């Protein structure tokens, strides 16, 4: 599956926001000017965006945060729109309950791409069974454990240390770093999710 492998700073500048594509222990380089768009004329690009452009940029930002392609993201939106409740909130909850994202939230990896790699390399067990599908949907009460091989990896050990140092573990997961395991306690409410995401703009875009 196609994945972006270019400079993460370029993506962050394009969206004007930190997309959590780098470890919290390595802040975005001072050269990564988020207020300046990438490209030769980035510094001179000014002016108010149209409603459509604003909606599009918000969708692109969220896609890049979770590392999804357009087809994947649209499928999540379609699924969210068929569920009861607020479509935008449903969308974020579906994204947050992906296995790769839960591993990231538990601190097993410093970024979502790194968490996805752990999953694809069969380093993650859900309720005792190996799962290598990053999009696997986690349910309340599911137990996540890293394989013995993954537990020995320095990058995993460092990731857990970074998560503890930066207090990154959200309230809806419980982690035992010594056992390299965690429990997904509950699907997060909207109030528990990032406030810098305006999911209503995405709903408006796809509703057209």
Curated annotation (Swiss-Prot):
<dbReference type="InterPro" id="IPR005709">
    <property type="entry name" value="Ribosomal_uS4_bac-type"/>
</dbReference>
<keyword id="KW-0694">RNA-binding</keyword>
<dbReference type="Pfam" id="PF00163">
    <property type="entry name" value="Ribosomal_S4"/>
</dbReference>
<dbReference type="GO" id="GO:0003735">
    <property type="term" value="F:structural constituent of ribosome"/>
</dbReference>
<dbReference type="InterPro" id="IPR036986">
    <property type="entry name" value="S4_RNA-bd_sf"/>
</dbReference>
<dbReference type="Pfam" id="PF01479">
    <property type="entry name" value="S4"/>
</dbReference>
<keyword id="KW-0689">Ribosomal protein</keyword>
<dbReference type="InterPro" id="IPR022801">
    <property type="entry name" value="Ribosomal_uS4"/>
</dbReference>
<comment type="subunit">
    <text>Part of the 30S ribosomal subunit. Contacts protein S5. The interaction surface between S4 and S5 is involved in control of translational fidelity.</text>
</comment>
<keyword id="KW-0699">rRNA-binding</keyword>
<protein>
    <recommendedName>
        <fullName>Small ribosomal subunit protein uS4</fullName>
    </recommendedName>
</protein>
<dbReference type="GO" id="GO:0006412">
    <property type="term" value="P:translation"/>
</dbReference>
<dbReference type="InterPro" id="IPR001912">
    <property type="entry name" value="Ribosomal_uS4_N"/>
</dbReference>
<keyword id="KW-0687">Ribonucleoprotein</keyword>
<comment type="function">
    <text>One of the primary rRNA binding proteins, it binds directly to 16S rRNA where it nucleates assembly of the body of the 30S subunit.</text>
</comment>
<dbReference type="InterPro" id="IPR002942">
    <property type="entry name" value="S4_RNA-bd"/>
</dbReference>
<dbReference type="GO" id="GO:0042274">
    <property type="term" value="P:ribosomal small subunit biogenesis"/>
</dbReference>
<comment type="similarity">
    <text>Belongs to the universal ribosomal protein uS4 family.</text>
</comment>
<dbReference type="GO" id="GO:0015935">
    <property type="term" value="C:small ribosomal subunit"/>
</dbReference>
<dbReference type="GO" id="GO:0019843">
    <property type="term" value="F:rRNA binding"/>
</dbReference>
<feature type="domain" description="S4 RNA-binding">
    <location>
        <begin position="97"/>
        <end position="160"/>
    </location>
</feature>
<comment type="function">
    <text>With S5 and S12 plays an important role in translational accuracy.</text>
</comment>
<dbReference type="InterPro" id="IPR018079">
    <property type="entry name" value="Ribosomal_uS4_CS"/>
</dbReference>
């Amino acid at each position: 599956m196609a994945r972006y492998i270019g400079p993460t700073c370029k993506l962050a500048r394009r969206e004007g926001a930190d997309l959590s594509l780098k470890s919290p222990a390595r802040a975005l380089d001072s050269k990564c000017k988020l207020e300046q768009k990438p490209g030769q004329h980035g510094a001179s690009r000014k002016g108010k965006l149209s409603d459509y452009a604003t909606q599009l940029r918000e969708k692109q930002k969220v896609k890049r945060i979770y590392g999804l392609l357009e087809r994947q993201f649209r499928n999540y939106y379609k699924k969210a729109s068929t569920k009861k409740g607020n479509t935008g909130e449903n969308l974020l909850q579906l994204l947050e309950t992906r296995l790769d994202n839960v591993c990231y939230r538990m601190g097993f990896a410093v970024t979502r791409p790194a968490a996805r790699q752990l999953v694809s390399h069969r380093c993650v067990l859900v309720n005792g069974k190996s799962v290598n599908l990053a999009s696997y949907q986690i349910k309340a009460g599911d137990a996540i454990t890293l394989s013995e091989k993954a537990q020995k990896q320095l990058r995993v050990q460092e990731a857990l240390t970074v998560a503890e140092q930066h207090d990154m573990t959200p309230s809806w997961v419980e982690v035992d770093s010594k056992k390299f395991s965690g429990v997904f306690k509950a699907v997060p409410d909207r109030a528990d999710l990032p406030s810098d995401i305006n999911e209503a703009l995405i709903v408006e875009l796809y509703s057209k």
